[in-house]
UniProtKB/Swiss-Prot annotation:
It comes from Neisseria meningitidis serogroup C (strain 053442). This is Gamma-glutamyl phosphate reductase. CDD domains: ALDH_F18-19_ProA-GPR. SUPFAM superfamilies: ALDH-like. One of its GO terms (biological process) is L-proline biosynthetic process. Keywords: Amino-acid biosynthesis, Cytoplasm, NADP, Oxidoreductase, Proline biosynthesis. The lineage of its organism: Bacteria, Pseudomonadati, Pseudomonadota, Betaproteobacteria, Neisseriales.
Length: 420
């Protein structure tokens, strides 16, 4: 038995301590984890410095932000765990009840998933978010961090397990796979005897590898080729504010805009204003400017590189924005449906008909009208921290909170009935 299999077996053996814990016990464990995380801040920051030093020069600046921890972010992680503790416990919720003509009483009840596996890349905060959500939803959790963030993840998990050790929940219910090589990931993908669910969080390559190779049931958290369409009837002040936020607030995250579509009737006047905001104003403020990849029509109005064949199918995760002009809301919808990963897409318009057409025909997990796509987030949706953004339709779609991490079973109460 490999070390990875041993860790999977430990999690499976410990799951009953979580599955059978009541709400008070789980909340007490989460609060202890949050306190322990803050108490271990110095150790976590030291580990994070190791990750940052190893990554220096090997990843883009925008990706470094995903990896970076500081005191404020550790406090935010701890507060995120406390926020999960404050959420209603979904386990045990009665979803439906019915009584059959023969007198059988049927109750559909929400239950824990069992053991959840998470494979993720260079975001240390996912470690605490995933642990908190899995444990509150009644499941043990097996984490597999990417190499870039492994030292940070190890220090975070050590702190969380120290918190669990003060409670009735077995610390073995939280595991961090030590094997950061490819084989560690593939063992999790094949671990049908140990894992009830596997969730990948990361880039397109990771997600594709898990979806194509896993025998464990998977919820796909897709990449975010996120579009915003500026309609000819848009309020320009709203449009400029929304585009600025959606592209520049955190370009390295999956709900950041990657493609801008602009109605051709306003492109000549709107795009130069946008260029001033995203390029010259940011340079003057000492901020990284946005670099444009332009279709031929957009290139007539602002400066940038000519868009290549793949630029409208790329999740840049950087200060890069692909820009295209379109002749109508119908063309915008066609382009989005052709290139979208069905994560988050939005329209800016004051035209109700255009907005209704867009929301009806765009088949994404989150569809926005006159708002930034950066709101596609479990915390912003009132779900607490999230396990990821599901872009599939079965079981879960959009930000995955506690309810999306549970299953259900039927309890059938009889008085001696037999089937004729």
């Amino acid at each position: 038995m490999s070390n990875t299999q041993k860790q999977l077996a430990l999690a499976k053996a410990a799951k009953k301590s979580v599955n059978t814990a009541d709400t008070e016990e789980k909340n007490r464990a989460l609060l202890a984890m949050a306190d322990s995380l803050e108490a271990a801040a110095a150790d976590i920051l030291a580990a994070n410095r190791q990750d940052l030093e190893a990554a220096a020069g090997n990843i883009p600046e925008s990706m470094t932000d995903r990896l970076l921890l500081d005191g404020k972010r550790i406090c935010a992680m701890a507060d995120g765990i406390r926020a999960v503790a404050a959420l209603p416990d979904p386990v045990g919720e009665i979803l439906e009840t019915s009584t059959l003509p023969n007198g059988l009483e049927i109750v559909k009840k929400r239950v824990a998933m069992g053991v959840i596996g998470i494979i993720y890349e260079s975001r240390p905060n996912v470690t605490s978010d995933a642990a908190a959500l899995a444990l509150k939803s009644g499941s043990a959790v097996v984490l597999r961090s990417g190499k870039d963030a492994f030292q940070s993840a190890r220090a975070i998990v050590a702190a969380l397990k120290a918190g669990l050790a003060q409670t009735r929940i077995d610390p073995d219910a939280l595991q961090l796979i030590e094997d950061t090589g490819r084989e560690g990931s593939y063992e999790m993908m094949r671990a049908k005897d140990y894992l009830d669910l596997l969730i990948p969080r990361g880039g397109a390559g990771l997600i594709r590898a898990v979806v194509e190779n896993a025998v464990v049931p998977v919820i796909e958290t897709g990449t975010g080729i996120v579009h915003i369409y500026i309609d000819k009837d848009a309020d320009w002040d709203k449009a400029l504010r929304i585009v600025y936020n959606a592209k520049t607030s955190r370009p390295s995250v999956c709900n950041s805009m990657e493609v801008l579509l602009v109605h051709e009737d306003i492109a000549a006047d709107f795009l130069p204003k946008l260029e001033r905001l995203l390029v010259r104003d940011r340079i003057e403020a000492g901020l990284p400017p946005v670099r444009f990849r332009l279709d031929p029509q957009a290139a007539r109005h602002i400066g940038g590189e000519a868009a290549g064949a793949d630029d409208f199918d790329t999740e840049f995760l950087d200060y890069i924005l692909a820009v295209k002009t379109v002749a109508s809301v119908e063309e915008a919808v066609w382009h989005i449906e052709t290139h979208s990963t069905h994560h988050s897409d939005g329209i800016v318009t004051e035209n109700r008909h255009a907005a209704d057409y867009f929301t009806t025909h765009i088949d994404s997990a989150a569809v926005y009208v006159n708002a930034s796509t950066r709101f596609t987030d479990g915390g912003e949706f009132g779900l607490g921290c999230e396990m990821g953004i599901s872009t599939q339709k079965l079981h879960a779609r959009g930000p995955m909170g506690l309810k999306e991490l549970t299953s259900y079973k039927y309890i059938v109460q009889g008085t001696g009935q037999v089937r004729e």
